[in-house]
Amino acid sequence: MYRLRMHAILLGIAFLTATAALAQTGEAPHKNEIGLVIGATETPSIGRIAGGEIDLDSSLALGAEYDRRMFGEHTTLYVGVDFLASPADVKVSYPSPDVSPEYAYLFLSPHIKVKFNSTRTLQPWLSFGGGYADFSPTATKNGDVNVKGRGDSGTLEFGGGADTRPLIQFKGVPLLKNLPIGGRFEVRDFYSGQPHYGVETRGNLQNNVAFTGGLLIRF
């Protein structure tokens, strides 16, 4: 599972970067943005009906994001899609034998985004969307007990962040040399169903809060 997810993430990032490079032409206004981000996802503790809580460790998060500017000059409206996945899996801290000990996640979420001060150096924004969440176990056995962690659901996504104007150019790198590259810093919550932890929990939804930052490519 780990290798499959890593291959999917790397292929997706390579495809988006190549698409941006090939689409770059002249001095036309940039209507498209691709964000390549890395960070961590935090999930609050999950309460158990039998008592106690399921505590989850932070997990590495890798993401790719595409946005298309629809209209606006200083305040602009974008539509796009977010992809976020965990190449390193979410682990339960000190899991009991009946709890699924770890799982991987994947979120794919179309969204709308409103960006402010689009012509300034620092450009704050807010986004809202919804899509698909997938949870897959990487270990289905904890001790002598078989547990399952697989599950999928819908997700609501809401968050905010800030982009910067272009800061660097890779002039000596083929394909990338003409692309203006800025920075992106963001916090997003993917509010979704839960993976199957193997025990009954209080409620069936959870917050998956991603803190990420990285490069923003415009073309």
Each predicted region: which residue ranges?
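Gram-negative (and chloroplast) outer-membrane scaffold detector with strong preference
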Residues: 60-142, 153, 167-170
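Cleavable N-terminal export/targeting peptides
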Residues: 1-30
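Short glycine/proline- and aromatic-enriched beta-strand/turn motifs that initiate or cap beta-hairpins
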Residues: 23-70, 212-218
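Transmembrane beta-strands of outer-membrane beta-barrel pores
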Residues: 38-44, 68, 83-89, 130-136, ...
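Predominantly the C-terminal beta-signal and adjacent terminal strand-loop region
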Residues: 28-29, 164-219
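Transmembrane beta-strands of outer-membrane beta-barrel proteins
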Residues: 32-36, 77-81, 106-108, 122-130, ...
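Outer-membrane beta-barrel translocator domains and adjoining extracellular loop/strand segments
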Residues: 45-52, 90-97, 136-145, 195-202
